[in-house]
């Protein structure tokens, strides 16, 4: 009994704990196959558990199809169906309608019109609005055309045909108003010149008189100068000579 009780702890500790050195190699080999079998059984169970979801997954669409058929069967199909059509009521604010290829915003109809231009399905055929020119622009165009016609009429025929342009210088005849203006200008110029000459003469005379008053000997020379500047009428007349007044005359 003592031997059996002494060997039991060693055998019981072997599977749970580390086998002691007292165990024989035959006993250890007998324990290893049991462990390998236990390890091999776990992957089989795991693979079997993984196989169940794969089988359950395809069953779900089948169940959903059955539910859809039941829902369709429960709906009454005797209700008459009518076609529902929607017509555009108006362009909402902040939205622009779609345009067909090759069209522009000018082709859009007015807001009050019935048809609206879209992708080409709802747009109706309408006459395009003609732009009216401003009357001022029309008058300017007419003036330009008249001016071009007049200028073309004044150009010589040789120049219009592409030949060498003939240069002609036309003397403009002076109008009577221009002549009067020129005469008035010339008259005023002459008057101004005369006044200037008179002013110069007066200044010269004043300066001479002042100088004569200061210098007594200059008076004789001042009297001689105008006599020399006079035109010579009779050189033989002794009365015209200076300093011979009253010589040869009888009183």
UniProtKB/Swiss-Prot annotation:
**What is the reported tissue distribution?**
In the embryo, highly expressed in the sclerotome. Also expressed in the notochord, neural tube, limb buds, heart, branchial arches and head mesenchyme. In the adult, highly expressed in skeletal muscle. Expressed at lower levels in most other tissues.
**Cleaved signal peptide residues:** none
Which stretches does UniProt call biased (Polar residues)? Answer: 84-94
Cellular component GO terms held in the UniProt record: cytoplasm; nucleus
Q: What is its main location?
A: nucleus
Segments carrying the region annotation (Disordered) are: 1-64, 84-167, 230-251
Superkingdom field? Eukaryota
Q: Please state where this protein is localized.
A: Nucleus; Cytoplasm
GO biological process terms on file: dorsal/ventral axis specification; embryonic skeletal system morphogenesis; maintenance of protein location in cell; negative regulation of DNA binding; negative regulation of transcription by RNA polymerase II; negative regulation of Wnt signaling pathway; regulation of gene expression; regulation of JNK cascade
Q: Does the keyword Transmembrane apply?
A: no
| An MF annotation (GO) of this entry | protein sequestering activity
**Which keywords describe this protein according to UniProt?**
Cytoplasm, Developmental protein, Differentiation, Nucleus
Subunit and partners: Interacts (via C-terminus) with AXIN1 and LEF1. Interacts with CCNT2. Interacts (via C-terminus) with Piezo channel composed of PIEZO1 or PIEZO2; the interaction prolongs Piezo channel inactivation.
Q: What does this protein do?
A: Inhibits the transactivation activity of the Myod family of myogenic factors and represses myogenesis. Acts by associating with Myod family members and retaining them in the cytoplasm by masking their nuclear localization signals. Can also interfere with the DNA-binding activity of Myod family members. Plays an important role in trophoblast and chondrogenic differentiation. Regulates the transcriptional activity of TCF7L1/TCF3 by interacting directly with Tcf7l1/Tcf3 and preventing it from binding DNA. Binds to the axin complex, resulting in an increase in the level of free beta-catenin.
Q: State the similarity comment.
A: Belongs to the MDFI family.
Q: What is this protein called?
A: MyoD family inhibitor
Instruction: Tell me what organism the protein belongs to.
Output: Mus musculus
């Amino acid at each position: 009994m003592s031997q059996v009780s002494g060997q039991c702890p060693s055998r019981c500790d072997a599977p749970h704990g580390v086998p002691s050195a007292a165990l024989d190699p035959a006993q250890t080999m007998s324990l290893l196959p049991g462990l390998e079998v236990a390890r091999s059984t776990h992957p089989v169970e795991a693979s079997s558990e993984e196989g169940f979801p794969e089988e359950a997954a395809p069953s779900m669409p089948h169940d959903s199809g059955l539910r859809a058929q039941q829902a369709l069967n429960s709906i009454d199909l005797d209700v008459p169906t009518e076609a529902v059509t929607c017509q555009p009521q108006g362009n909402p604010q902040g939205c622009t309608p779609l345009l067909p290829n090759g069209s522009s915003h000018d082709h859009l109809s007015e807001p009050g019109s019935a048809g609206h231009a879209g992708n080409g399905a709802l747009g109706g055929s309408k006459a395009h609005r003609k732009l009216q020119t401003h009357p001022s622009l029309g008058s300017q165009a007419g003036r330009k055309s008249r001016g071009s016609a007049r200028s073309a009429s004044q150009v010589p025929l040789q120049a219009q045909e592409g030949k060498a342009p003939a240069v002609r210088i036309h003397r403009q005849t002076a109008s009577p108003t221009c002549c009067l203006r020129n005469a008035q200008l010339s008259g005023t110029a002459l008057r101004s010149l005369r006044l200037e000459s008179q002013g110069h003469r007066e200044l010269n005379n004043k300066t001479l008189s002042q100088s004569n008053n200061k210098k007594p000997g200059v008076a004789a020379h001042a009297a001689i100068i105008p006599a020399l500047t006079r035109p010579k009428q009779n050189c033989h007349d002794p009365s015209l000579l200076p300093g011979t007044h009253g010589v040869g005359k009888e009183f």
